[in-house]
Every structure is written in structure tokens, then in C-alpha cells.
Amino acid sequence: MDPGREDEVPLAATSPESRRTRSNGRGKATVGDAPPPAETVVSTKAAPLPTGGWKKGIAILDFILRLGAIGAAMGASILMGTNEQILPFFTQFLQFHAQWDDFPVFKLFVVLNALAGGFLILSLPLSIVCIVRPLAVGPRFLLLITDLVNMATVIAAASAAAAIVYVAHNGSQDANWIAICQQFTDFCQGTSEAVVVSFVAAVFLVCLIVVSTLALKRT
């Protein structure tokens, strides 16, 4: 055997590891190495859950306003429905008597305000649902629709009754209608109070509509 060839290493005997090492020395990527693992960032903060805090406050305000609207609507209906006056000077055959059901408009006033108050009472469970679930859209939208109908009903009844009350107080020279409130003072005062309370119910309903609109607004 030639001693000069002892230091020679055959090319076929070169291991793949040595070739990879030589490639690394030249700045090239290693063939068999796996890519470094991606860094994962773990957040320790808990994701905030949607609680709808301000909407819950609006729902509580809605419930309070609804109670006020119920009291005003039912109060207006009761005031008008119990309003009557008999003048003290009368005989057995002649009486001067004024009663709410003598006027068809006042009958309509009593019925419409009572209906509005009844619908408002029926809407209380939905208002409670909106307090428990302030993010629910369905109950809130249904409340908005019913409040719009009730507002239109109450305003129509109060406006029609206000026209009759005005004629009762001032009369009409063109139609030769005399003012009766100079004689039936208590009756006219009762009708005026009922009309004012009915308009208060309408104001409550307007506030309820604004509250429902704000509650339906997305944040």
C-alpha cells in the first residue's frame, strides 16, 4: 500500500453530515435542520364580556317612565269618567246637569286613555325583560312600536277633548254656542284637569320613545 495515500479520504466516504457542515460554513441554510419554532404570545388579560351597563340603566329608566305614563293615562280616564255636576237650583221637573257622557268626544277620550293605560300595563313584563337582558333587540323594538301607537292615540284624544273644553270655556259667537263654564265651574275644571293629565301622559310616551331609540342604538 502506498504510504502517500494514507491521508487521502475518498469522496464517497464523506458523510452527509460533513457536507451539511461545510455548507453551513459558507452561510447557506442547513438542509436537514427544522425551522425555529414560532413564538406564541399568551395574554393574561381576560376578554371583557358585553354587559350593556348603560343600556341596563336606560331599561330601568324606561320602566320608571312607563309607570308614570300608566298613572297619567289611567288618571286622565278616571278624572273624565267621574266628572259631573248638578247645579244647586233645580226643581222636581227641571234639573241643570252636566256629565261627561253627554259629549261623544269625552266618551272617546275616556276609552282611548283607558286603552293606552291598559297597553302600557301589558308592556311592563317586556320592560322587565329589557332590564334583565339589556342587549335584547326584539322586546325593545316591540316596546317602541306599542309606544308609538299609544302616543298617537293619547295625543288624538287629548287634542279632541281640548277643543271641546275650549268651546265650553269661551263659546263660539259664529255658531251661537254659549260658554257653559260660567255656570258649571266644577265640571269644566274637571275636564280641564283631565285634558292636562292626558297631555302629561303623552309627554311620558314621547320620553319612552326616545329611550327605546337610544337603547336600540348600536355601540
From Swiss-Prot:
Membrane topology reported for the UniProt record: Multi-pass membrane protein
Extracellular side: 79-108, 169-193
Residue pairs linked by disulfide bridges in the UniProt entry: none
Keyword Nucleotide-binding belongs to the record: no
Residue intervals on the Cytoplasmic side: 1-57, 130-147, 215-219
Coiled-coil residue windows: none
A GO term from the CC aspect: plasma membrane
Region spans: Disordered: 1-43
Principal subcellular localisation of the protein: membrane
This protein's name: Casparian strip membrane protein 3
Naturally occurring in which organism (per UniProt): Lotus japonicus
Highest classification ranks of the organism: Eukaryota, Viridiplantae, Streptophyta, Embryophyta, Tracheophyta
